From Swiss-Prot:
UniProt organism field: Mycobacterium leprae (strain TN)
BP terms from Gene Ontology: DNA-templated transcription termination
Lineage of source species: Bacteria, Bacillati, Actinomycetota, Actinomycetes, Mycobacteriales
Keywords for the protein's UniProt record, in alphabetical order: ATP-binding, Helicase, Hydrolase, Nucleotide-binding, RNA-binding, Transcription, Transcription regulation, Transcription termination
Residues reported in the UniProt entry to bind ATP: 352-357, 364-369, 395
Protein name, UniProt field: Transcription termination factor Rho
Annotated function: Facilitates transcription termination by a mechanism that involves Rho binding to the nascent RNA, activation of Rho's RNA-dependent ATPase activity, and release of the mRNA from the DNA template.
EC number per UniProt: 3.6.4.-
Biased composition, class Polar residues, residue ranges: 178-187
Coiled-coil residues: none
């Protein structure tokens, strides 16, 4: 049975009464159709017109519109009037008979119109009562009945189906604007068939649509919590998008158990993207699980923000308004005598809190191993720092290795995931780091790699039409630069240090374009050499081009003078000889302090000799 049949069956009772009323005491059906005036026909609903047309002998009424049915009935009226005119002389024997016939026709017309009005009022009252007492689904069925006055029955039925499908689909908060447009386009467009009826029905529909939009849109009110509700605690990272927000409960990627947060709650409590929030959601009652309108469970209570109270979070400063400075507090990476990687970095490229460093590496030069050594050194020597390792477009086995070898927060999106996941993970991770810096904490972010992040933005972002060499869109270069530019030392307290890897010599013109964009943004650079790595010498550091800007702020005056003499000696050698000499001398000492003392005693000249 189709939906058209259901609509027709739902109105059979009224249509039968109407048909019986119209055809009572009228031997000629066509004459009865003729007695109904044009005004009466325009006030009838579509099923009533079809029933009247069928009684009048009109065929094919199921596919006719309202205007076509009225025209067909008018044609039958004309035929009936013609018959009456032709038969008039034989039956009309006087003025009294004509007057009686006219009065009878007028009385019959008034009776038909009264019956139609009573039937319509009864059905309207039943619809209004059902709309008040029944749920949303009953209200939609009543709306389909009331829409019988629309010009196009097929279009009305399709609109009802679309509205029903939208209701069943639930409040997809990712498409709020589309839902609102669809809801507004499904407004009933009926004729004014009663004084005040259109206004009452319009207000009823507007109120219902307003409730729907309030439930579905991101600007909706907060979910109310009743006393008898059972709540369940939740915690996660807040991800604020355009018109809605979610608490990511399973990490930094979207998951099926994420919690929806209304925009009113976000604005009311001053929430920001990257906040670590705790709260509660309402547990669905028995039998309510299958009838939930919302795809995600909403947050009904907010307990804490970043481990503190909600009121304290409203008073925190904004990251963009904090004053950045050059790094002036050093991060010591030296750990054990046999861990030469961190010892070389301390000598060649000292790192401070708030540093923006790039590890420029060709493939298979050991950049991932260097990142692991740096991460372990930070967690061992700098316990006050919060470590975050962000792996973008990385191999799954390297993610597992990093998670097991690093005592820190590892955030990863493997290469088998879409580019949009890479960009989402990186953006949410850097926003989380900013929120920690706003609290005055020192954060260290290790990114592998900035080149792959640029590729992901190039593939995920819409084309702007300005394509650079290598197929790189010009708009895809700004988001990775914004990520790297977040590193800074804050004057008011706290710092954000970013150490990112950049790939070169990959044979890709696009990778070279991305690297050239970031080349001048960092204030420290560690360059790896593939030829040194092919000789199985690790770390494969090219000493001469590596270094740190303003390194005198990180080193003591005595240490700065000795390091300066060391760099002058190594600059006279090629890259292979320089790293070999440095590694051989480091193996002879247990600490960098001993090595620098030895250099000061054995190296002739000073930084002032020229």
């Amino acid at each position: 049975m189709t939906e058209t049949d259901l609509i027709t069956v739902g109105e059979n009772t009224d249509d039968t009464e109407l048909t019986n009323a119209v055809t009572t005491d009228t031997p000629d059906v066509k004459a009865t159709a003729a007695t109904v005036s044009l005004g009466s026909l325009s006030t009838m609903v579509l099923p009533e017109l079809r029933a009247l047309a069928n009684q009048a002998g009109v065929k094919g009424t199921s596919g006719m519109r309202k205007s076509e049915l009225i025209a067909a009935i008018e044609e039958c009226r004309g035929q009936a009037n013609g018959t009456s005119v032709n038969d008039g002389p034989s039956r009309d024997h006087g003025g009294s008979a004509t007057a009686i016939s006219t009065e009878a026709l007028a009385a019959q017309e008034e009776q038909n119109y009264a019956i139609v009005e009573v039937s319509r009022r009864e059905r309207r009252g039943a619809s209004r009562e059902a709309d008040v007492t029944a749920g949303t689904s009953t209200a939609e069925a009543t709306e389909s009945d009331c829409q019988g006055t629309a010009d196009d029955d097929t279009r009305t039925l399709q609109g009802g189906q679309s509205d029903t499908k939208t209701e069943e689909r639930g409040p997809d908060v990712g498409n709020d604007q589309g839902v609102e447009q669809q809801s507004s386009s499904l407004q009933p467009r009926g004729d004014d068939d009663g004084e005040g009826r259109q206004g009452r029905r319009g207000r009823r529909f507007r109120d219902r649509d307003r409730r729907r939009r309030g439930e579905r849109s991101g600007d909706g009110a907060e979910a109310e919590l009743r006393q008898d509700d059972v709540v369940q605690p939740v915690a996660g990272i807040l991800d604020v998008l355009d018109n809605y927000a979610f608490v990511r409960t399973s990490g930094y990627l979207a998951g099926p158990h994420d919690v929806y947060v209304s925009m009113s709650m976000v604005r009311k409590n001053g929430l920001r993207r990257g906040d670590a929030v705790t709260g509660a959601v309402r547990v669905p009652r028995e039998g309510e699980q299958g009838h939930q309108r919302q795809k995600f469970n909403p947050l009904v209570r907010l307990d804490s923000i970043n481990g503190g109270s909600v009121e304290d979070a409203k008073k925190r400063p904004e990251f963009g308004k904090l004053t950045p400075l050059y790094p002036n507090q050093r991060l010591r990476l030296e750990t054990t005598p046999d861990r030469l990687t961190t010892r070389v970095i301390d000598l060649i490229m000292p790192i401070g809190k708030g540093q923006r460093a790039l590890i420029v590496s060709p493939p298979k030069a050991g950049k991932t191993t260097i990142l692991q050594d740096i991460a372990n050194a930070i967690t061992r020597n700098n316990l006050e720092c919060h470590l975050m390792v962000v792996l973008v477009d990385e191999r799954p086995e390297e993610v597992t290795d990093m998670q097991r070898s690093v005592k820190g927060e590892v955030i990863a999106s493997t290469f088998d995931r879409p580019p949009s996941d890479h960009t989402s993970v990186a953006e949410l991770a850097i926003e989380r780091a900013k929120r920690l810096v706003e609290q005055g904490k020192d954060v260290v972010v290790l990114l592998d790699s900035i080149t792959r992040l640029g590729r992901a933005y190039n593939n995920a972002s819409p084309a702007s039409g300005r394509i650079l060499s290598g197929g790189v869109d010009s708009t895809a270069l700004y988001p990775p630069k914004r990520f790297l530019g977040a590193a800074r030392n804050i004057e008011e307290g706290g710092s954000l240090t970013i150490i990112a890897t950049a790939m070169v010599e990959t044979g890709s013109t696009g990778d070279m374009v991305i690297f050239e964009e970031f080349k001048g943004t960092g204030n420290a650079e560690l360059k790896l050499d593939r030829k040194i790595a092919e000789r199985r010498v690790f770390p494969a550091v090219d000493v001469n081009p590596s270094g740190t800007r303003k390194d005198e702020l990180l080193l003591s005056p005595d240490e700065f003078g000795i390091v300066h003499k060391l760099r002058r000696v190594l600059s006279g050698l090629d890259s292979h000889q320089a790293i070999d000499l440095l590694m051989s001398q480091l193996r002879k000492t247990k600490t960098n302090y001993e090595f620098l003392v030895q250099v000061s005693k054995t190296t002739p000249g000073s930084m002032d000799d020229d």
